Structure formats: C-alpha cells, structure tokens
Amino acid sequence: MSRELILLIAGQSLTHACMAGMRLAAPLQALRQGYSEVAVGVLIALFALTQVFLALPSGRYADRHGLKRPVRYAVIAAAAGAGLAAIWPIFPVLCVSALLTGGATGSSVIALQRHAGRAAQTPTQLKQVFSWLAIGPAFSNFFGPFIAGLLIDGAGFRAAFLAMALLPIATWLAMRRATELPPVIQPPGERRPRAWDLLRDTTFRRVLLVNWFLSSCWDVHTFVVPVLGHERGFSASVIGTLLGAFAIAAGLIRVVLPMVAAFLREWALIFGAMIATGVLLGIYPLLQTPLAMGLCSVLLGVALGCVQPMVMSMLHQITPEHRHGEAVGLRMMVIQASSVTMPLLFGAAGAAVGVAGVFWAVGVWVLGGSRVAWLLRDDRKS
C-alpha cells in the first residue's frame, strides 16, 4: 500500500468518523432534551439529505479543482458543524450540525474517490485502490460512535461534540501531504456537459442500477433486522451483535479483495453478490436463533461488502476522466436518496405484510435485478 493511499484512507476515515460520531451523539442529546422519536428521525435523516443535493455540485467542483480545495472546504464545514453543537447543544443547532457534517463528509468522499481513481493506472489497480479505500468507512463507523459514546459517558455531550470537531482538522493535516494530480482539461470544442448526459450511457445506467439494488439490501439489514429481533424478544445487545457481525464481515472482505483483485471480474462479483444476497434475504426470516441469524448476517456482509469497490472501479473505467467527479457524485446522490426513502417504504411495507414479507419481497426484487448485472458481462466485452 502506497503512502498516498494511506493518506487518502486516513483522510476519508477521520471525516467520516466525525459524521458517524455526530450521528450517535446528536440524536442522544435530542432525546435527553425530551424531543420525540419523530423529531429524532428527522434529525438523523438530515445527515443524508444534504448529500443528496450536494453530491452533483461537489462532483463538478472536484473535476474543476482537484483534491485539496474541496477537502479544505469540507473540513471547515464539518469542524464548524460539530463545533456549533459543542457551543450551543440545542435542537435547531443540532439540525444545522447534521446538515453541515453530512454534506461535508459526502463532498470530501467524492473528491477523495475521484483522486484515488485517477491515481490508479490499470483496472487491477482500480479494484485494489477502491477495496482499500472502502475499509475507511467500515472503520470510522465503529471509531466515531465509540469515541463519542465514551466521551458522553465520561465528560458529557459538549466534550463529545468538541472531539468530533477535531477529527476533520486531522483530515486536513493528512491531505496537506497528499500529492495533487495535474488538472484534467475538457477536450476542446466539447460543449459543457450536463450530469444527466452520463445516464445516456447504457453501461453507466446498469452500474448505477445494480448499486441501487444492493444498497437497498444493505438498508434492509440495517433497518429491518432490529425490528425482527425485537419481535422475537432478543435483547438490545444481541441485536447490536447481529448488526456488528454484518459490519465486521463487510469490512474484512474489503481487506481480502486487494489481494485477489487481479483474479476478479467486476461484473461476475456483482452478479454473484446479487444472487447470494437474494437467497440469504429469503432465508433470513426463517431463522429463529441468534446464532443462525448471526451467521446469515455475516454471509450478507461478505456479499454486500465486496460490491462498492467493484462499482467504483467500473465507474472510473467507463466515464471520461474529466467527468469522474460527476460520475461519483451522481452515484452518491442515488445512494443517499435511496437511504432517505427506502426505510420509509420498508416501514410501510412491514406494517402491511409483516417483516418477513419485506425480506422476501426485496430478495425476489434483487434476484430479478441480477439480470442487469449479467448484462454488464456483455458491456465489458464490447
């Protein structure tokens, strides 16, 4: 692993850890202040909502200005968001903090992923780079909430918010040492493109579609497994262990991917992940014991954890270099919009047909969608 890649992983992890820690601390503070679960749900949604609207502009900005300037502005926004919560820990300010830290994290990730993709020289390197880079969020989703939780219990909410404000500053210390790549010049005579023009490419649409299918399956596990565990009388620690087993498996498979990247084909891995995910979602609600459900969660984590690096590798291969930022931004916009809306649909479906019905419906849906991944095979040949 190169020094440059280590800096990128560190930068992405620290900014993401700030948002992950705020996503734990801000709702807890709101609950302590007596706000309803509905208000807390709105607060949590704000972390993703900003990314939906900022993803495309952030991608275009990264295409024009490279790595360091977008990350610098993201660091300022994230540190300001967490810092405001430390100074005025009241609900309206917490909402502003959620918007700032969520948007800043999304913008910095787009710039970092674009830079990492440009630095890779071959398709194998692309798969390796994005596999290593995908480890960062898996680590920060543990590190940020862990530090925030310790500080809340030991020193209070203000200390936790202040610590989260320091993490983006550490990101900038890492990014200052990164090497800025030469700017990509738009081909002369080409009209200024619109982001939606990318969707005219059939392969691009298919890659986004399979990413959306599998991202929705990730959301099913995150939001529906706790409901299923509650129905069966599992304790909070058991439900947390199920979610933790899934996250650890998703992270560990990303450690393995760089070592075998040369032997993998993106379309084949994505197709296999969709088949495995559909089958596992069909089985999951039939399992009755925590041990069996935990094993199924691990297998789901392995299947879904290997998808993002392959999707990012394909996006960078099929998109013009001067539009990599837009492509990454468009992908993030789709995924974040899904993360905002899909839990609402799952909740409505669960009330109508039951939790098991949600698993089975999404399992059939993703199995049917696997045909899109199979068609990527022909796209890679052409």
Language model features: what each stretch is:
Residues M1-S2, E180-L208:
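Juxtamembrane intracellular "pre-TM" segments in multi-pass secondary transporters
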Residues P92-L100, L291-L299:
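Paired small-residue
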Residues L99-G136:
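Cytoplasmic helix-loop-helix junction between adjacent transmembrane helices
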Residues A165-V184, G369-R377:
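C-terminal membrane-cytosol helix-exit motif in multi-pass small-molecule transporters
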